[in-house]
Amino acid sequence: MIAKLTGVLDSSGTDWLVLDVAGVGYLVFASGRMLSRLPTRGEVMSLFVD
């Protein structure tokens, strides 16, 4: 199971984001609350997966 991802924010939508981790793009579905707190595209971020 994946517990944490750290990478570059590639893109995001109304209920998802793509996090580029070492060249692999992870599609992560997330709440609007979490998505409203995202950094700018291209910045490094970490997220814990529940």
Language-model regions, residue ranges each:
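A positional/architectural concept
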Residues: 1-50
